[in-house]
Structure formats: C-alpha cells, structure tokens
C-alpha cells in the first residue's frame, strides 16, 4: 500500500532528526493515514479510501460525492 492520501495527495516527506548536539540524521515524516469506509447513498454501497485526517475533514466539509467526483476526474487526467 502506497503511503499517499487519495483525497489530498499527501505523501511522506524527508527531513532530519536533530539531536541536542545538533547532529542530523535522516528520517521520514509520514502522513497520518487511515483506511476508512464511506457510504455512497447514490450508488448504495460502501467505498474504502486511504485518507489522511486532513482528507477526512475535507470529506466532512464538501461531502463524499463531491470529493469522489474530484478523485475520479484526477484519475482520468493522469491516464
């Protein structure tokens, strides 16, 4: 499973751990991803999405149908 939010497109970022002595070691900042099922009333079925917590807030704000429409448009453009 790729660590990418299907709504926002958030991906892991790279950076440094910085010690008290200012020594830097590489690390990854991972997005807070959750697998969630959402009910689609139009299609009368569930859909499972891998979304970040920020993506969940977007779904709460805009609605699952509007967000799913944007995801499907983005997938068509990439093909």
Curated annotation (Swiss-Prot):
Domain of life: Bacteria
InterPro entries assigned to the protein according to its UniProt record, in alphabetical order: Ribosomal_bL28, Ribosomal_bL28/bL31-like_sf, Ribosomal_bL28_bact-type, Ribosomal_bL28_sf
Biased composition (Polar residues): 11-20
Keywords, ordered alphabetically: Ribonucleoprotein, Ribosomal protein
GO molecular function: structural constituent of ribosome
A GO CC term assigned to this protein in UniProt: cytosolic large ribosomal subunit
Record-linked SUPFAM superfamilies: L28p-like
Stretches for region Disordered: 1-26
Stored Pfam families: Ribosomal_L28 (PF00830)
A GO biological-process term: translation
Family of this protein: Belongs to the bacterial ribosomal protein bL28 family.
PANTHER family from the UniProt entry: 39S RIBOSOMAL PROTEIN L28, MITOCHONDRIAL, LARGE RIBOSOMAL SUBUNIT PROTEIN BL28M
Protein name: Large ribosomal subunit protein bL28
Source organism (scientific name): Coxiella burnetii (strain RSA 493 / Nine Mile phase I)
Gene: rpmB
